[in-house]
Every structure is written in C-alpha cells, then in structure tokens.
C-alpha cells in the first residue's frame, strides 16, 4: 500500500535511501552518501511531498516529489525487482501531469527503468556535488 510519509517512517526511509544509494551508485564513494544522511533527514525529506510503499507494516520504498520533480525514488535493495518501484512511479504519475528527474548516466538499470515507464531524455548535466554526469528526463511535460 502507498501512503503519505509520517515522521515515524524517517529511520526506515533513511536506511533505504543509504543502502539503495550505495548499491545503485557504486561509482560514487559510499562515504559521500553516508555524509548526506543528516541533510536528507533535515532538509530534503521535510521540503518534499513524500510517499511510502508499505508492506507487512514495514517501509519497502519511498518517493519524494518537489513540485513536478521526482526528487527521489528508492526501493529497499532486498525488494528491488518485485514491482515496488513501478507501483510507486505509477502513483507519482497519478499525482502530477508531468514529471522531471535527473539520474546518473552510470546508473544504467535506473535509466532503463525510467525509459520503460515512458520517460524520455531531455539532455545532460553534471551533478555539482559528485562531478558525475546526469541525464535530465521527463514524463509528459
């Protein structure tokens, strides 16, 4: 079930974010992601509209919207490939007429996932925090 984020979810969300970030972005030092946990908790999650996918009273994944930007979508690594991400992305699409996102170019599985979900590439940019190239993608904007 997908529901709105509650403050009690924060520890599970941060655990998922950190473990999934390290797994998906092995080309960035794990220490970088660990250094961003407090910023996620104190800045990014509160500033966004966040929803969680709950299964058996546990958070299995979450996504965050900031305006029409899909600012985050993360699934617990042990549940990836089981439809959680697709369900969350479908939910996000139902809440916005269009969505934009950025994804690291080295993150081929996520790029393929977004393309399968109907996103198209608009161009490229460099993430100032990591120096890695990203694709800018959109869905029906």
What do the PLM-derived regions correspond to, one by one?
Residues 41-52, 69:
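A short helix-loop-beta-strand connector motif used in the catalytic cores of GNAT acetyltransferases and
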Residues 49-61:
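Conserved beta-hairpin
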Residues 14-40:
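Conserved GNAT-fold acetyl-CoA-binding loop/helix
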Residues 69-80, 103-104:
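A short, internal acetyl-CoA/4′-phosphopantetheine-binding micro-motif in the GNAT/acyltransferase core
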């Amino acid at each position: 079930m997908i529901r709105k984020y509650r403050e009690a979810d924060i520890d599970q969300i941060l655990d998922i974010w950190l473990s999934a970030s390290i797994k998906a972005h092995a080309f960035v030092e794990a220490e970088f992601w660990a250094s961003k946990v407090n910023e996620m908790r104190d800045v990014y999650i509160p500033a966004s509209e966040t929803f969680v996918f709950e299964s058996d009273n546990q958070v299995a994944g979450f996504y965050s919207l900031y305006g029409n930007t899909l600012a985050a979508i993360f699934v617990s690594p042990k549940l990836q490939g089981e439809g959680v991400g697709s369900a969350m992305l479908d939910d996000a699409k139902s809440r916005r007429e269009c969505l934009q996102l950025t994804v690291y170019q080295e993150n081929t599985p996520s790029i393929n996932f977004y393309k399968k979900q109907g996103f198209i590439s608009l161009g490229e940019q460099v993430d100032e925090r990591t120096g890695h190239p990203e694709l800018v993608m959109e869905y029906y904007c």
